[in-house]
A protein has these predicted regions:
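Rossmann-like NAD(P)(H) cofactor-binding subdomain of soluble oxidoreductases
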Residues: 80-146
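N-terminal Rossmann-fold NAD(P) dinucleotide-binding loop
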Residues: 8-9
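Rossmann-like NAD(P)-binding element
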Residues: 46-107
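Conserved N-terminal Rossmann-fold NAD(P) cofactor-binding segment
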Residues: 23, 27-65, 79, 298-306
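Conserved S-adenosyl-L-methionine
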Residues: 17-23, 127-130
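Glycine-rich Rossmann-fold phosphate-binding loop(s) that bind the pyrophosphate
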Residues: 4-5
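C-terminal substrate-binding/catalytic lobe of Rossmann-fold NAD(P)-dependent dehydrogenases
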Residues: 126-132, 142-306
Length: 306
């Protein structure tokens, strides 16, 4: 774990409980911070599975299965994720070459924001194959959507199948047209549960999901538990070679006329990272919004010097 702030530390805590790893190394510019977090989290090991958790350095990256990068400036109240571009690209310019020097051959998972931009930056700076560099993308946004829909319909959110695609940020797109609850189209399920204002309800839910991070940051200055669980889930899929479908951020080539940009689309994820895209059905309006989201990210990438 590179970066031991709120997100990095919460993610290590979640991973400690998962039983996925026998060794977790924490790396941070502030070595004392990394050591303190490692000590604190290690004291929970007797309640989990045997493993080693310790503060290390970039030499520990060489034989790692997964490197998670959460290092970066955090989002402050009033800031968008894209406001963090210049600060965090500069941080990545110092981190990624250090990883590349160690001939790292595992999976790189980018969590820092803006995650779509930084995933593409990591691909360019690392020289790793595109399929081995993944961003956490809209895995958390999609979980928030499923949670909200489960709450709205009074059903288990695990039975809700719905994705948010595009940017992890303000231009994200809810793929309503492919959303369902255990195979029942969402609009039908809403009526079955006594909700008939489908258009108004979906608009309210989409807005609530998009603004949830801003709301949490305004109330407690950071979000970390939800993303920690997202990191744990992505790591599970990779380590167990589950070939699960997750809306992670990755390089897109030729899906919905989008090419050469990293954003979130459902993909089959396993031990080798991205196996293939799953081009889910989108309405004409959703596809147009997705293209706009991609174009906005592309314009930002064009301004970055690497």
């Amino acid at each position: 774990m590179i970066g031991c702030g709120f997100v990095g530390s919460a993610s290590v805590f979640a991973l400690m409980q998962s039983g996925l790893f026998t060794e977790i190394v924490l790396i941070d510019a502030d070595k004392n911070k990394a050591e303190g977090e490692a000590m604190d989290i290690s004291h929970g090991i007797p309640f989990a599975s045997p493993m080693k958790i310790y503060a290390g350095d970039y030499d520990d990256v060489a034989d790692a299965a997964i490197v998670v990068i959460s290092a970066g400036a955090g989002q402050k109240p009033g800031e968008t994720r894209l406001d963090l571009v210049n600060k965090n690209v500069a941080i990545f310019k110092s981190i990624i070459p250090e990883i590349a020097k160690r001939n790292f051959a595992g999976i790189m998972l980018v969590v820092a924001n803006p995650v779509d931009i930084l995933t593409q930056v990591a691909i360019k700076l690392s020289g790793l194959p595109e399929n081995r560099v993944i961003g956490s993308g809209t895995v958390l946004d999609s979980a928030r959507l499923r949670y909200k829909l489960g709450e709205h319909l009074s059903v288990d959110s695990r039975s809700v199948h719905a994705f948010i695609v595009g940017e992890h940020g303000d231009s994200e797109v809810v793929a309503w047209s492919s959303s369902n609850v255990s195979g029942v189209p969402l609009s039908e399920m809403c009526e079955m549960r006594g909700h008939y204002k489908h258009k108004e309800n979906t608009a309210e839910i989409a807005t609530a999901v998009k603004n949830s991070a801003y709301e949490i940051i305004n109330k407690k200055h950071a979000t970390y538990y939800g993303i920690a669980m997202s990191v744990k889930r992505i790591c599970e899929v990779i380590m167990r070679d589950e070939k699960s479908i997750l809306p992670v951020s990755h390089m897109i080539h030729g899906v919905y006329d989008i090419d050469g940009v990293s954003l979130s689309m459902p993909a089959i994820v396993g031990a080798d990272g991205i196996e293939s895209d799953i081009p889910i059905n989108l309405s004409g309006e959703e596809a147009l919004k997705l293209k706009e989201s991609a174009d906005s990210l592309k314009k930002i990438m064009e301004t970055i010097e690497l």
